Amino acid sequence: MDLPGDSSTPGRQRLCRQPHAGALWGAKSPKRPKLQPLGAPSPLEKASRRVLAVVLEDVMAARMVPLEPQEESSTPRHHSNHRDSVRSQPPASPPRQAMWSPQARPPDPLHLCREPLSRIRRPPSTPRRQSRTTPGPDEGPSQKVDQVHQPTLVVMLQDIASSRPRAEGFADEAPNFIIPARRAEPKVMVHQPKPPSRDLPAPSRPSALSANPLASPPPAPDPVLEPPSTPPPSSLLRPRLSPWGLAPLFHSVRSKLESFADIFLTPNKAPRPPPPSPPMKLELKIAISEAGQPGASEGTVTVSPRPPIRQWRAQDQNPSATLTKPSLGRSHSCPDLGPPGPDPCSWPPVPAPSSRPRPRRHTVGGGEMAKAPPPPRPCLRKEVFPLGGVGASPPLVTSCSSTASTSSFSEPAEPRLSSTKRKEPRAPEDQVLPDSETKTIGKVSRFRIRRTPARSQINLTPMGLPRPVRLNKKEFSLEEIYTNKNYQSPTTRRTFETIFEEPRERNGTLIFTSSRKLRRTVEFRDSSLPRSRRPSRGARATAGRTLPPSLAPSPDVEPLLQQRLQELDASLLEEEEEGDQDQPHRT
């Protein structure tokens, strides 16, 4: 389908952007191979090329301004036994001002052709393509062509390389370079015949196309902005020395080509693991400082860790370094920090508190708050020594080592040396006590560990309550029985026939005995003896089988049994004899 205003001959070949391998690809080979050979594009690649063609068509359609094409005259040239045609279009009429709107686009996208706006050097009418596995740069265009013809997406861009002002109709003109898209598929090569030596461009190629020399031939000048005289064919192939005018558009189209090719032509990539984040280092430094005297704020304070006890004792014996320092009345397990001084390596003595009030920072109150004594210094560890007090002896103050200025923490022996002096009065007490007592005082070793569990007490109930104490007596008088606190008079339902039973009156008559069967004798067992346990059900069953010895037959009963058996036998014999005598009478 021709563009609007096309007056060219119907048999003229056109530059078409169509992704299907149809009209222009099989000129040399009339029949397409049925089987897909090695190196042929896969269906995924074909689909991606179609998508690229549609996207580029939408991008460039709004900026395309068609010209009325002129008649062409072709001059044949022979190079490497192949024919290349150079078209020349003399502009016979001024360009039209009508824009090609998107509504006037041809309905058939498969045969969409865009006429070039200039006399450009076309690729050969039957471009040769060869699929190979390892493309080499030294491959000549005269090499024989493979039978497989693959469609290549061709984007036509043209640079308006002229310093003259543009015509009004070319305000939105799109560039027209012939750029084969070979971004993501290195196996598909486009071979074009080289121009003769006399037509080679003298100046260097532009910087925009130098990165892709095989895919972008040199552009052609614009014939519309030139004088109407027909230039020689050699000048048509030579680019002009002028900057590129539409380089940003070219880069945008190229970036879209690359992005679509990366999406549709690259295989699935394994997800890369995120780069390992650098480990976080948390450093917590706690410095205990106090507001010093006015005028000494420019000094620095260094906090020293707790020195070992051996260092305290070693320096405790050196009285030359002792200086008076008032105690602050706080826990003696934390170091005593002096005020900052000009020398960071020494701990100057603290002067005695003067009578004048000490100025306090960040206070808005009156003189009462200013006269109040300063609070004790903060303590990081809560340890209290029993012998430490407020009025104890002053601690020792020494100078730090010479390496304190280079290190972050110095180690003076001053902290908590007052506690060592407070421990001195306790030393003679420890010497008076023997070694055996000092080892056992306040230790767990003095408690004996029982190897066997303690026996449970008998006079306790299962709940742990004490049992009532009973007298070990076998005979009780009636007074003791009835005066016992545990005695209760029998109720009407629970009455016993005793000598003290009171008669009850029923229906006007006195009843001395009850109608219930009551036991006349009561056996009082000794309470000191343990009660006999009731036999279990299994024991009762076994006891029923074997007679107890009290119920066992005595030897006197045996002759009685024998006599009884003999009597039974005699009676049986008599009955038999009587039966024998009655039988003959019946016969």
From Swiss-Prot:
Interacts (via proline-rich region) with GRB2 (via SH3 domain 2). Interacts (via N-terminus) with CBX5. Residues 215-234, 337-356 have a biased composition (Pro residues). Residues 85-378 are annotated as: Required for the interaction with GRB2 and sufficient to promote the phosphorylation of AKT and cell proliferation. Residues 1-135 are annotated as: Sufficient for heterochromatin association in interphase and chromatin association in anaphase. The modification Phosphoserine is found at S277. Residues 519-536 are annotated as: Required for nuclear localization. It is found in: Chromosome; Nucleus; Nucleus lamina; Nucleus, Nucleoplasm. It comes from Bos taurus. Keywords: Acetylation, Chromosome, Myogenesis, Nucleus, Phosphoprotein. The keyword Nucleus applies. The lineage of its organism: Eukaryota, Metazoa, Chordata, Craniata, Vertebrata. Coiled coil: none annotated. One of its GO terms (cellular component) is nucleoplasm. This is Proline-rich protein 14. GO terms for biological process: muscle organ development. It comes from the Eukaryota. Residues 200-214, 398-410, 538-548 have a biased composition (Low complexity). The keyword Acetylation applies. Residues 572-581 have a biased composition (Acidic residues). InterPro entries: PRR14 (IPR026320), Tantalus-like (IPR028149). Pfam families: Tantalus (PF15386). Its main location: nucleus.
